């Protein structure tokens, strides 16, 4: 067995194509990893929580694979690779903000340009403010790709309003 993947399933396969975990499979394919590997993935959040857990996994997986190959990687590179993997390898209809935020970590002001480039400026909040930040899981589940698809389909309908905002 060349690849062992432990998540809600236990996989022991010989080729990347046999891997069922979509994120692991996509990252291994993207970075052309052909040596055997074992991945253990345990998450506290259920899938489709809307809290960026998929992008967190993709960024973390890519980072781990780069480290295993002794390849230095920047936060910017991790973000761009995660976007590429999720949008063009996994073919998910997702945005870019989750991947950027996960790659950079912390609290940030992110400006995303129309051409896909971005700037990420870390924010150092007052400690009192930090003590009062709360992340809330609502228990609702949704597919980010469905939401993104709906937003894109509504773009033409709402383009006048969007242009005024931008």
Predicted regions and their residues:
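Residues at or immediately flanking beta-strands
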Residues: 36-38
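Helix-to-disorder regulatory junctions
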Residues: 40-41, 54
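Short pre-catalytic strand/loop immediately N-terminal to key active-site residues, enriched for Gly-Thr
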Residues: 43-49
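DPxDG-like acidic metal-binding loop motif
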Residues: 51-71
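C-terminal nucleotide
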Residues: 1-33, 42, 65, 69, ...
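Short, conserved micro-motifs enriched in small and acidic residues
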Residues: 18, 51-56, 76, 163
């Amino acid at each position: 067995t060349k690849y062992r993947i432990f998540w809600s399933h236990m996989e022991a396969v010989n080729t990347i194509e046999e891997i069922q975990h979509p994120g692991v499979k996509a990252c291994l394919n993207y970075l052309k990893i052909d040596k055997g590997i074992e991945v253990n993935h345990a998450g506290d959040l259920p899938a489709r929580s809307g809290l960026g857990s998929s992008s967190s996994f993709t960024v973390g997986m890519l980072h781990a694979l780069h480290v295993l190959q002794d390849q230095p990687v920047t936060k910017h590179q991790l973000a761009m690779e995660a976007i590429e993997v999720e949008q063009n390898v996994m073919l998910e209809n997702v945005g870019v903000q989750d991947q950027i935020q996960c790659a950079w970590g912390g609290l940030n002001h992110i400006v995303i340009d129309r051409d896909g480039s971005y700037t990420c400026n870390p924010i150092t909040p007052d400690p009192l403010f930090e003590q009062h930040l709360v992340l809330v899981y609502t228990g609702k589940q949704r597919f980010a790709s469905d939401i993104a698809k709906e937003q894109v389909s509504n773009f033409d309908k709402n383009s006048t309003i969007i242009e005024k905002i931008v």
